[in-house]
A protein has these predicted regions:
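A short beta-strand element within beta-rich, extracytoplasmic domains
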Residues: 60-70, 78, 158
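Short coil-to-beta strand junction motifs in C2/discoidin
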Residues: 74-82, 152-155
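Cysteine-clustered segments with highest specificity for TGF-beta superfamily mature ligands
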Residues: 115-146
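Glycine-rich, low-complexity segments
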Residues: 1-32, 89-115, 165-170
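Short beta-strands within extracellular/lumenal beta-sheet-rich domains
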Residues: 41-56, 61
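Extracellular Ig-like/FN3 beta-sandwich strand-entry sites
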Residues: 59-61, 75-77, 131-135
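Proprotein-processing/basic-patch segments
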Residues: 141-170
């Protein structure tokens, strides 16, 4: 069946080249403090993270939703794209990501620090030969050519959806 895994911004890191800003902690006047990775409005920026999927994963495509905010009253859209690559034991870590896939760009609400959640993306094909007992690296990108928010997009995390073909990992 369909399962999900939450990847918070605190589990991601900016790329060395064209990376987003380092993790920031935002203190709001009420409610939780939030931790974000801030992606610039002027150029595509990236962050990466890794997942070791359970043995019950069917080794197929994944989909995702991005959770983000902006400390702006702008109502522009934000476009997030995800790509992935599976690396097996004794494989080179220097392997290219698959094709990035983006859901429809999501408009910010126009209220500073409101939570925005994208629609679920189309299928993201993971490069390499995905299998269990492999590490899958992902790259999340703000694609500024496909969005219109004139402020930093503050990524809170993403939810990855994957399909299982077994009841457990036994």
């Amino acid at each position: 069946g369909k399962e999900s895994i939450w990847i918070p911004a605190v589990a991601m890191y900016p790329n060395t080249t064209n990376g987003c800003a380092d993790l920031a902690q935002v203190e709001l006047s009420n409610g939780p403090e939030i931790k974000t990775l801030d992606f610039d409005k002027d150029s595509d920026e990236n962050a990466q993270f890794a997942v070791a999927f359970p043995k019950s994963w069917n080794e197929g495509t994944v989909t995702f939703q991005a959770f983000f905010t902006a400390d702006s009253t702008n109502t522009g859209t934000v476009s997030w794209a995800l790509s992935g690559v599976a690396i097996a034991d004794n494989d080179s870590c220097n392997t290219a990501f698959g094709t990035a896939v983006a859901p429809t760009a999501k408009a910010h609400s126009g209220t500073a620090n409101d939570l925005d959640v994208t629609a679920e993306s189309g299928a993201v094909t993971i490069a390499g030969s995905p299998s269990t007992d492999e590490e899958v690296y992902f790259q999340i990108t703000r694609d500024v050519s496909a969005d219109s928010l004139t402020a930093d997009a503050k990524l809170l995390g993403i939810k990855i959806f994957f399909t299982t073909d077994a009841a457990n990992d036994a």
